[in-house]
Design a protein with these regions (language model features):
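Short, Lys/Arg-rich, polar N-terminal cytosolic tail immediately upstream
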Residues: 1-29
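A structural signal for multi-pass alpha-helical bundles of membrane permease subunits
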Residues: 30-314
Length: 314
């Protein structure tokens, strides 16, 4: 009888022991432990992102007085509106051109810095990072003074050499280029520091092997450097595209969407329609147009990164 009771007890204890053993094995994996440590932050970020998004979708389906459900009428109204079509074009033009310029200039600066050794690199790197560490609103105010038609420093220099003053923020294409230029000035250091870190991680043996094979500088760039940096380039471009599409400070401070709505982007137009004009549902509809654009971009970029990571692992 005693032996029978012992066997029964062991049988009863077996499932719990097995569960504890599987839990220990699960916790031994570093990735699982890391996930558990990040879980509180993930939950917090999800709450801060999901709730505003769902609430914005709800608001976008109400009428101006927020008393009646109108479905997708606000979106249909925006798509037929010439001003919004212009905003859509300007947002895409602003984001794509600014990101391309930032990525290109950041890559060039990273290469130049990579060839500087010792303490000089730290000094130059710190100087080039200055635009990125200054608060954006403050630095944009400085640019506004430089572009001001009454006391523009740029126009003073042009006048000193006998050229006429330029309406930097008064002509639509010049204003667009000025807005893009300020965004590029602010965001290029981010690309520079990311690409510099990526360049330092490229093994020197690859360059030595390419030299032995007779490769010149351009061949090393296209067949060694760029393939090794593809993932970091993709991630930085995606991140910058998201931030640039959502940019507000630069356009709002420099032009407030003018002249004649010619520099409005999604964020500033949503602010004008939703806050200044008092049509919050329509403003929410404007802001939500960014979501599908960025979702499509993120899908293709992350799919490419995942595919390349699997190829490297294989």
């Amino acid at each position: 009888m005693a032996d029978g009771a012992t066997i029964v007890g062991r049988v009863r204890k077996t499932p719990s022991v097995a569960r504890r053993g599987s839990l220990r094995r699960w916790l031994r994996r570093k990735s699982n432990v890391g996930f558990l440590m990040c879980l509180p932050l993930i939950v917090l970020i999800a709450a801060l992102v999901i709730y505003p998004t769902v609430y914005a979708i709800y608001l976008s389906m109400l009428n101006k007085n927020m008393t009646q459900f109108v479905g997708l009428s606000n979106y249909a109204f925006l798509l037929k509106r010439n001003t919004f079509q212009l905003v859509f074009f300007q947002s895409c033009f602003f984001a794509v051109s600014a990101v391309i310029l930032k990525a290109t200039l950041g890559f060039i600066l990273a290469h130049l810095l990579h060839n500087i050794s010792g303490g000089n690199q730290r000094i130059v790197r710190g100087m080039l990072l200055t635009p990125w560490v200054i608060p954006l609103a403050l630095s944009t105010l400085g640019w506004q003074w430089l572009f001001d038609p009454s006391y523009s420093a740029f126009n003073w220099v042009l006048n000193a050499f006998g050229f006429a003053s330029v309406p930097w923020l008064g002509e639509r294409w010049i204003a667009r280029l000025c807005v893009i230029g300020v965004n590029v000035w602010y965001g290029t250091p981010f690309f520079m520091i990311m690409y510099l870190a990526a360049l330092k991680s490229v093994p020197e043996q690859l360059y030595e092997a390419a030299t032995i094979d007779g490769a010149n500088a351009m061949q090393k760039l296209f067949f060694v450097t760029l393939p090794m940096m593809r993932n970091i380039i993709s991630i930085t471009v995606l991140f910058s595209l998201i931030v640039t599409f959502a940019d507000f400070d630069i356009v709002r401070i420099l032009t407030a969407g003018g002249p004649q709505d010619m520099t409005h982007i999604f964020a500033t137009y949503a602010f004008e329609v939703g806050i200044l004009s008092g049509d919050i549902p329509l403003g929410a509809s404007v802001s939500l147009f960014i979501l599908p654009i960025l979702s499509i971009c993120a899908y293709f970029v992350l799919r490419g990164v995942t595919r390349r990571s699997k190829e490297i692992a294989a």
